[in-house]
Design a protein with these regions (language model features):
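Active-site neighborhoods and metal-handling regions in enzymes and metal-associated proteins
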Residues: 1-108
């Protein structure tokens, strides 16, 4: 890893490939969430499913534990604050749901 100045760190081709793999884990996780997102499902269920999926891919949840975050996904329903925590309240027909996810793969 080459360092330029004090703020830019160049990544090797190998590091970039690992970062790409981490991004693929996140993309696939969000795809799995989208498949299951429907009325009656709880954000807490989606969160556990996402954690299990990320771990099955050899990665770890990127948000869980970061700054004390207790969840794998950050889920906001309707006018809820951005990056809300998953709850047991079922999603209802017509709800607007936003989901954020992160994963760490081989340190990236």
């Amino acid at each position: 890893m080459a360092v330029f100045g004090e703020s830019i760190i160049y990544k090797s081709r190998e590091e970039i490939e690992i970062m790409r793999q981490a991004a693929l884990v996140v993309s696939r996780t969000l795809g799995e969430v989208a498949k299951r997102l429907k009325p009656g499902i709880t954000p807490a269920f989606l969160d556990q499913m996402a954690e299990d999926y990320i771990k099955s891919q050899g990665a770890i949840p990127g948000f869980k534990g970061l700054y004390g975050c207790p969840s794998t996904l950050l889920i906001s329903v309707n006018e809820q604050v951005v990056h809300g925590l998953p709850t047991e309240k079922p999603i209802e027909e017509g709800d607007i749901v936003s989901v954020d996810c992160g994963a760490v793969f081989k340190g990236y």
